[in-house]
Amino acid sequence: MNTLLVGINVAVMLILVGVLYYMQRKHVSFNKRVFTALGIGIIFGLILQFIYEPTSKVIIESNTWFGLIGSGYVKLLQMIVMPLILVSIISAFTKLQLTKNLGKISGLIIGILILTTGIAAAVGIAASAGFDVSATGLQQGDAESARLKLVEERFTSIEKTTIPDKLLELLPTNPFLDLTGARPTSTISVVIFAAFIGIAFIGVKRKYPEQAELFKKMLDAVYAIVMRMVTLILRLTPYGVLALMAKTVAGSDINAILKLGNFVLASYVALIVMFVIHLLLIALSGLNPIQYLKKVFPVLTFAFTSRSSAGAMPLNIEAQKEKLGISEGIANFAASFGVSIGQNGCAGIYPAMLAMMVAPTVGIDPLQPQFILTLIAVVAISSFGVAGVGGGATFAALIVLSTMNLPIGIVALVISVEPLIDMGRTALNVSGSMTAGLISSKWLGELDQDTYNQDDTKTGEIAS
């Protein structure tokens, strides 16, 4: 019986995929197809929630099949991330876009990311205090116990790593290993490796212009192929969003969400407030925040459904260049740094809120100015090297809680609402990286104002 029901659910999913394909054949815009996929996915997931239990075998098996589309799409995006970073950053050097301002660009982007992470921590602290979020009364079930065991194992490895060691991990000892994304800091390491190649190219160009020109032509060909691959993968976005949203909604435990409703509500209020702060920073830079919102919404939608900052990188870079008018070099640096440094959601709001929740259980008044200022500083500094894939928020929370000498068990006790909150956190992470790129590009005079101010209908569509 279960097999039949699973088959029906999968058949419905395939029909919905067919609807999106029909819309594509009718040349419905990319943005409209993404929004349609988001809405249909939520409705389909809610229907499955209503008919079955979230923990039922039918839902679990159906979600496994849905994962062929949703998770498969995310994996394709992750496949292209490292080649895209490597080729794009080297290409920026060969086109002389980063020669003069490399240090200024890197410093400004990282500075904005760290600053906004500190602000995000303050917002998380305010939300926790405003909603009186507390760890008191949280119950530990089987799922929480299993998660706690994993958390403690991970904490043991983190505890042994000193701050100098963490900084050394950013350097690429084996760039080919980092191209596989094997380490949490692989993205930053690839950026550094690509920058070294770019700097070496500039030196070779002065002494051996013929060899440099040959390298540039080869790189241009590789760059064209990689960007074509990106375009092909991004065309699948509506299908990926549909499957990811349906899977997430269908598998969410409503009862568990209601039990931690105050924490979920406080988290999303903090996320929304921080997103508004992004818009304010853009406005203060002399740009129209409404234009930004309209142009990046499809990217944020995908980040929300996929829960992967790294997976959203190709969309992120494409939107910065084609929609916002950000120069290629800055777009690549901002997206790359934003995956591992200064994530406003995962490394800013989330660790700060957990620290505020657990502090009273060990006799600390979380509203003491000294505690708050220390927490903000620790969160900002600890935001280096947080992986842009699932689990990055846990990694950041463990670092912050251990540095503040607070119990780490709280990380396991909120597992039931982790997927729901992680969706909003990831969208904020991606918005933070694009905001950093946009503001940096504006301040350095690298922004194409005409592209930024154009209506969406006049600019080239993502994945067109």
Curated annotation (Swiss-Prot):
Record has rRNA-binding as a keyword: no
Subcellular location: Membrane
Organism: Bacillus anthracis
InterPro entries with a match to the protein in the record: Na-dicarboxylate_symporter, Na:dicarbo_symporter_sf
MF terms in GO: L-cystine transmembrane transporter activity; symporter activity
Claim: Transmembrane helix is one of the keywords in the record: yes
UniProt GO cellular component terms: plasma membrane
Family under the similarity heading: Belongs to the dicarboxylate/amino acid:cation symporter (DAACS) (TC 2.A.23) family.
Membrane topology category: Multi-pass membrane protein
Protein purpose: Mediates uptake of L-cystine, the oxidized form of L-cysteine.
Parts of the chain that traverse the membrane: 3-23, 34-54, 73-93, 107-127, 184-204, 225-245, 263-283, 347-367, 371-391, 395-415
Keywords: Amino-acid transport, Membrane, Transmembrane, Transmembrane helix, Transport
Record's protein name: L-cystine uptake protein TcyP
